[in-house]
Amino acid sequence: YTKAEDASYQGTGYANTEGGGWLVHTQKNRGEFYQNFCLRLLETRNCVGWVHFEYNDGYDSNGKASNKGVVSIEYEPYTSFLSQMRQVNLAVHSLIDYYDTKSVQ
């Protein structure tokens, strides 16, 4: 997964130190990463599905926040991230058809 540097709580940026994953600049970049990741999964033609594991951002055991969710700690949606998730998720069946056709050629 990816975490964005622009995530914050009451004006203070998240530490984003919990867990693995990549760090990107913005929520839009998180969406681009998500789309690219999903496209590569579909292109392999052996993926049975995927899930975004975290609903909301959270804290680690030291009280430091990490940007893992589709909504903030205050349950505000990351609209630019979600719109890109929605775009690829709505197109998944046509993308599967595309990659299936491409592999036959």
Regions found by a protein language model. Name each.
Residues 53-105:
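Aromatic-rich peripheral "rim/lid" segments of glycoside hydrolase catalytic domains that contact
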